[in-house]
Amino acid sequence: MLFKKKVLATSVALAFAGTVAPAFAQTDDQLEGVDQIEIEEVIVLGGIRGSLKRSMDIKRDSAGVVDAISAEDMGKFPDANLAESLQRITGVSISRERGEGSQVTVRGFGPEYNLVTLNGRQMPTHSASSRSFDFGDLASEGIAGVQVYKTGRADVPTGGVGSSINISTTRPLDAPGQKMSLSAKMVNDTSTREGDKITPEFSGIYSNTFANDTIGIAITASSQTRNNGVNSASTTGWFTRAGDHSGAGGIPNDANQVNRSQSADEFSSIPQQIAYSIAEYETTRTNGQVVLQWAPTETLTGTLDYIHSEHDLDKKMSDLSAWFSNASASSQSSTWNDGAQRSPLMYAETHNFADFAMGLHQDGRKNTNESIGLNLEWDASNSLSFALDYHDSSAETGANNPYGTSSLVTIASFNKVASAVYYGQEMPVLVQSLNSGADGADRPLYKNDMVVTGSVFTNDEARMDIEQAKLSGVFEFSDSSSIDFGFQMTEVNNRFASRNVQLDNWGGFTQPGELSAVIDRSSMAGQFDQISGGNDPRQQTEYFTADIADVISVAEASYTARGAAYAQVGDCGTGYCASTDWNADKRSTEETTAAYLQLNHATEFVGKPVNIQVGVRYEETDVTSAALAPTYSDVYWLGGNEFTMVEALDADGNAIQAFDAYTGDYDMVLPSLDWDIEVAENVVLRASYSKTVTRPSFTDIQGGITVNSTSFKNTGADASGGNPGLVPIKSTNYDVSVEWYYDEGSYLSVGYFEKDVANFIGSSVREGNLFNLNWPLGGTLFNEAVTASGIDPLKYTEVGAYIFANLADNAAVQGDRIYGVNGDPLVSFKVQSPANQETAKVDGVEINLQHNFGETGFGMIANATFVNADVSYDNMKIDSQFVLNGLSDSANLVAFYDKGALQARLAYNWRDDYLAGVGQGAGTYTNPTNVESYGQLDISASYEYSDNLTIFFAGLNVLEETYNVYGRDKLQVLQVGQTGARYDIGVRYSF
């Protein structure tokens, strides 16, 4: 396949030599395995059309199914956010944070199933538990292109059942000479209430070569600041019960419940808590990269690169909320919709002066990514070449302020006598009845009613380090045959540490009136005007806000005045800040050795060009995981059916914790086969077979065992832990597609894919002894009491009473406790841990049309993906069930104009409803979290004022779409919110 090796080098050189200065394109090393064809003549195109043509050429000339995005011009990617650009690719959907693209789903497989590499190198993530990459950390200005490998290949790193996504950056020797591009823009985010309406963004890229183009340097830098707001209404979780349920947490079956479900095969769900929140965010991104290249000879090139990115996110949020006590309320009333799965149209409770809570949040997080790498390429002969690549990369995250990564200080008035919530519109309508006056009439809030209640300061830090070395080579037997080979060693170290500082003063701590000087009356009226029901006049909108530091000062002064002790303290010495004295510390190490062979062969079949690529990859991985966990020394019995574990303490009374380490290992063989034939002129038929894997999450492979509760009954204790012995989730993939390249920059493709996936992770339970704990049940003293008294040994309360009355002088009896002693039975633990159990089949169809309307400058892209699976969430089950998260159809429609000095684009992206996960944070733990379908229109335009100066404009979410997250049906709102539109205007100067 030698004739496919030269197109990128040729087109890149011509592109940079051209007057239009298009993108820094990808090198052969960066696009390792993306096969190419040599062409006689290259017409250099920049802008939208040039970017789309380069992406089309990569797709056409690749083995397997590969889609790509190329920069439109030097320092100009199609979107300011990489994830926003990726969603334009067929089969790729994204999730958004604060209205901005964050993570990707490919062919129905969520972020944790997609591997992200940078210049072919596996990149670390800072998500602590999963392997999901956050594209929000990287600015797009220094990116030359992105390639999405949808089928497996032997020479592509493993880790992506959904896809492997490679991000390519600049290389100065690919485009000799001096080039520079500087840009500045103003960003107007319409969603912010308190932040600066206009924030700046700056970026620059510089590339130059010296010494007859044998030495090169490229420098990229960018700085972004953005203020935005998110206004949301949420239900923190739903309790789902069968119609015949009459136990705790149920719904009374009386006249106050209208249309309540009645039978065991009908279900009703009631909310746990309703909250309205106003959040303000300030985001700062700083990105930089330096690339140095030296080619001392025509056959040897060395590249040293360093990449650094920082992403600071600060949040201030205030909220008001109503907690529903359900069966503990004074009374309940409800009205329900019809159907087997019933949701409330109205749910109400009365209370005996319960709390009306308002939360204050102020926290922040800083993400830092660093990577340094060295690459050496050596052409040993005309037919043999080698590449040595090494990198050391890290990603870390942690708090950037004293309040930790998440904080909550609550203030409340204890004058709530009734709460009601009305569903049926997009926004749940919360109605509060407040009464603290003697006349019994509803009354507004007064400052003197407010007191400080509970608080939580959560803090964590995470870091992942990846050290990777790879030796690869290509041996060309002839112009039509070659073999790729390689050997790679990778070490991944992941650590996550955390601690909560929590004061459970939910019944109130300070005295009424102490907060009056520091709180301000506020209103949420008009803050949900884009949401149906957001301006309902019944809503509770009045509440109080404050600076969290002022409220903390009042609370700390109250503690001091009372001489009260804090239940927990943070680094500041009080209970009102975060702590870095971690009590949870989880660490994992993966060491992987891999080798691969890949045969490439070009031939003909009945006169038609055929390309075949056959490969195999072998990997061995060793896993070591350790976690810091409490240890226990004793078990005591109070005489009933409750037993309690005693945490082990040192001589100073401090808890003894130990790192509990576990190991695992696995190996795997991953074959791949790609075949394509040009069945007619410009019509390519393609078929692929491969096996790909995704490794288990770091939560699933964590070491250590955590006791679920220190109190347990006669049946034994419960605990949970990870399982480093898990093997990867493995997919067998089949792809077939037909592609018609009918004109310059235009094509139509239709593809079918199928994935048979095994080793999905479920849960298993094993029994065993932990900590060598003796308990008195069935022990020497217990049996002595049973024998002497003749009491039935199953009547634990009577046996315990006999021991206290007649055997209290035994050493095992200490006060009101009976301890287990040596020789007594060991406590049996049921330990729940992850296990490879489940299988699933996913298939789908991808359709893509890209069309240029001749020389008019107009063009369009339309694509859609339809995905199916043989597993889905069953709304008529309450028990645990296996599901696939993120599965959804998606579509894109893009119209563009690119001619002369003017470029413009309208892009509409749509994603259907999808299951985001099981569990809602509260309520029934098996309830689903679904995301409603979402469509967004973005616009952009640029005008080349001169050969050097370009003026550009962009608008994101210009229709100001809102988002909706729901439970078992759309009446069960979990969150609905509005983020607003964002507009950019700026200039770019290139020379």
Segment roles from a protein language model:
Residues 26-75, 111:
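Short, acidic, small-residue-rich periplasmic hinge/interaction motif at the N-terminus
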Residues 83-122, 150:
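Extracytoplasmic beta-strand/coil segments of soluble accessory domains associated
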Residues 122-150:
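Short acidic/polar hinge/loop motifs at secondary-structure boundaries
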Residues 163, 169, 185-187, 198-209, ...:
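Outer-membrane beta-barrel transmembrane strands
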Residues 367-369, 588, 693-751, 755-757, ...:
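Outer-membrane beta-barrel signature, preferentially recognizing the C-terminal barrel domain
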Residues 505, 719, 775-778, 782-786, ...:
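C-terminal beta-signal and terminal closure region of outer-membrane beta-barrel proteins
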Residues 756, 761-766, 772-920, 954, ...:
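Gram-negative outer-membrane beta-barrel transporters
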Residues 757-759, 909-919, 942-991:
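C-terminal beta-signal and adjacent terminal beta-strands/loops
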